[in-house]
């Protein structure tokens, strides 16, 4: 779970009051958080970086794309608070301002939603950007298509606030952005920027500028091989002919995204009064949430937020022109009876609306249904249950009386679980290594790369990202994704997973069917059809299950080198040699043999 370090004095300043550790621990429950430590300085903070002998905090500066200043030790006379968040769905709480906002509003403080609306655009309202514009190259659509940003003006940045901004950007890029893979952020000196900006796709050979931490210009290739951030994140660009470059109207480079900023426009220092903050990535919702969160944070710190217009050369979910920060969230609904049923007690309407207000959610009551409008910095309401959880947290857990369960049952492992465990032990004995994968993925992984149609794929109604839009119907794509990332390891690779798969089916209770499935893969130059057939034979022999094989025609496998497995007179699985086109789609150069079994169908 995320752990954050925040400067105590800045936190209590934004909270508007001071409180002791016990009180803070109790109030943190509304954020599903715990106070882990409250007595160390920045010198002891392993997450936030260590002090160099010269008394400067250097690690977070080197790690963050958008900063180039160092913070003097004198700014950290007060202690830091280390807080563990028990929820990964609220990146807005990973900042000092975001956490202080929740605790302040939860305690009855006024919401600043009206203050945020002054700079937020939406589908109906477009705020004036006063000529601040970013034009996006059409060629970036398949590389890193989305970008958002804003300008923040105010009093000069203090060392503490600059340090906090660095920490927030790093957490968002590393955790929310999966180490800059889907999202990265940059911060620049706005007073030196000549608008409009161009977010271009350029050849790596055309890139040349002085990056952060360097004193002389480097070529694009040199940045990826010699600069610390290039060596760490250069793999994100290696598969593309063009790389994303952000430049201003004079041709001055702001950043080679998502690697590093330039040493001129990207060198933010203490005392700066105008900042341009941008976020780029592969998922538009994630990019907008990150920008909205940072804009609200800096607004809470007293800075004036000024929008920036983003002009695309291709269609996006919100059109070709989006002025950011942009409010895109959909309203969610939950019925009163659902709240009473899940929370286990009847609640009056006034209590429920108050609970939503304490979680900074706008709510309207319409005929027994609560219509909730999420805050601009949130995008974690996926289901009515999420809204009910907000009511629970808004009321605080102390106001719910514990109840002793009224039923008594004796538990035992199900037959399916016992069979699953036995199969795992057998496969480990056969030399296979167990893997665990996500159940969600993209159509590209589950269909396009596998030469399959999407006819029976289950689609999530409101996915957070395109990468997790569909429920897997087979484990084999997950095994191939692991093989792609394991090409550097010694062969042979023998891996398996036993987990859930789901697909649309007219025979299912809700039009879908969920199965416990076994998937296995063998990758090596010596792998053969006979070897994987022997594995199937040995596995079913140890399970004392007679079986037959029949000719199969699955587009994922080579025709004539695949077979269906039949047990109890029914088709329960398939195995064979993965089709060369599938391997090419996954960029795998080693022959692979794989198979899949419905574990539940093996039960008598």
Swiss-Prot record:
Its cofactor is Mg(2+). It is an enzyme of class 6 (ligase). GO terms for molecular function: ATP binding; magnesium ion binding; phenylalanine-tRNA ligase activity; RNA binding. It is found in: Cytoplasm. Pfam families: B5, tRNA_synthFbeta. GO terms for cellular component: phenylalanine-tRNA ligase complex. Its main location: cytoplasm. Residues 327-402 form the B5 domain. Keywords: Aminoacyl-tRNA synthetase, ATP-binding, Cytoplasm, Ligase, Magnesium, Metal-binding, Nucleotide-binding, Protein biosynthesis. It comes from the Bacteria. GO terms for biological process: phenylalanyl-tRNA aminoacylation. The keyword Transit peptide does not apply. It catalyses: tRNA(Phe) + L-phenylalanine + ATP = L-phenylalanyl-tRNA(Phe) + AMP + diphosphate + H(+). Mg(2+) binds at residues 380, 386, 389-390. The keyword Nucleotide-binding applies. Its EC number is 6.1.1.20. Transmembrane segments: none annotated. Belongs to the phenylalanyl-tRNA synthetase beta subunit family. Type 2 subfamily. Tetramer of two alpha and two beta subunits. This is Phenylalanine--tRNA ligase beta subunit. It comes from Treponema pallidum (strain Nichols). The gene is pheT.
């Amino acid at each position: 779970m995320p752990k954050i370090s925040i400067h105590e004095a800045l936190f209590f300043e934004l909270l508007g009051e001071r409180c002791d550790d016990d009180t803070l621990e109790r109030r943190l429950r509304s954020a599903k958080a715990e106070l882990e430590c409250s007595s160390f300085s920045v010198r002891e903070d392993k997450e936030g970086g260590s002090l160099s002998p010269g008394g400067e905090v250097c690690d977070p500066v080197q790690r963050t794309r958008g900063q180039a200043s160092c913070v003097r030790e004198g700014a950290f006379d007060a202690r830091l608070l280390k807080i563990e968040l028990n929820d990964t769905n609220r990146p807005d709480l990973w900042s000092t301002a975001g956490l202080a906002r929740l605790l302040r509003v939860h305690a009855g403080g006024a919401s600043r939603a009206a203050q945020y609306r002054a700079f937020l655009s939406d589908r109906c309202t477009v705020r004036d950007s006063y000529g601040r514009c970013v034009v996006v190259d059409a060629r970036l659509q398949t590389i890193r298509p989305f970008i958002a940003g804003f300008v923040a003006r105010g009093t000069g940045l203090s060392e503490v606030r600059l340090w906090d901004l660095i920490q927030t950007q790093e957490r968002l890029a590393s955790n929310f952005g999966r180490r800059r893979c889907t999202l990265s952020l940059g911060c620049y000196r706005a007073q030196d920027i000549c608008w409009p900006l161009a977010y271009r796709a350029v050849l790596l050979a055309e890139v040349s500028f002085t990056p952060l931490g360097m004193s002389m210009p480097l070529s694009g290739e040199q940045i990826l091989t010699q600069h610390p951030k290039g060596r760490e994140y250069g793999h994100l660009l290696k598969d593309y002919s063009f790389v994303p470059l952000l430049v201003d109207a004079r041709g001055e480079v702001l950043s080679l995204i998502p690697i590093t900023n330039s040493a001129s426009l990207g060198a933010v220092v203490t005392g700066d009064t105008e900042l341009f903050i941008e976020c780029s990535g592969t998922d538009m919702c994630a990019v907008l949430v990150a920008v909205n969160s940072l804009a609200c944070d800096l607004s809470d710190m007293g800075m004036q937020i000024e929008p920036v217009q983003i002009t695309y050369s291709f269609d996006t979910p919100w059109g070709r022109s989006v002025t950011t920060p942009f409010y895109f969230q959909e309203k969610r609904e939950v019925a009163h009876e659902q709240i009473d049923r899940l929370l286990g007690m009847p609640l009056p309407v006034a209590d429920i609306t108050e609970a939503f207000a304490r979680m900074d959610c706008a709510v309207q009551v319409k005929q027994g249904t609560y219509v909730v409008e999420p805050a601009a910095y949130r995008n974690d309401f996926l289901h009515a249950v999420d809204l009910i959880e907000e009511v629970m947290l808004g009321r605080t857990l102390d106001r719910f009386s514990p109840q002793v369960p009224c039923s008594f049952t004796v538990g035992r492992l199900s037959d399916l679980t016992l069979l699953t465990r036995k199969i795992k032990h057998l496969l480990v004995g056969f030399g296979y290594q167990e893997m665990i994968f996500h159940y969600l993925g993209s159509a590209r992984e589950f269909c396009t790369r596998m030469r399959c149609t999407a006819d029976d794929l289950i689609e999530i109604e409101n996915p957070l990202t395109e990468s997790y839009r569909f429920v897997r119907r087979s484990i084999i794509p997950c095994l191939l994704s692991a093989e792609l990332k394991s090409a550097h390891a010694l062969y042979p690779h023998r891996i398996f997973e036993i987990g859930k798969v789901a697909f649309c089916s007219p025979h299912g209770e809700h039009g879908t069917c969920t199965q416990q499935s076994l998937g296995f893969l063998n990758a090596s130059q010596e792998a053969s059809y006979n070897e994987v057939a022997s594995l199937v034979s040995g596995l079913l022999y140890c399970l004392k299950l007679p079986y037959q094989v029949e000719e199969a025609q699955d587009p994922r496998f080579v025709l004539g080198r695949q077979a269906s497995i039949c047990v109890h007179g029914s088709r329960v699985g398939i195995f064979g040699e993965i089709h060369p086109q599938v391997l090419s789609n996954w960029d795998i150069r080693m022959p692979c043999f794989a198979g899949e079994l419905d574990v539940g169908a093996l039960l008598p």
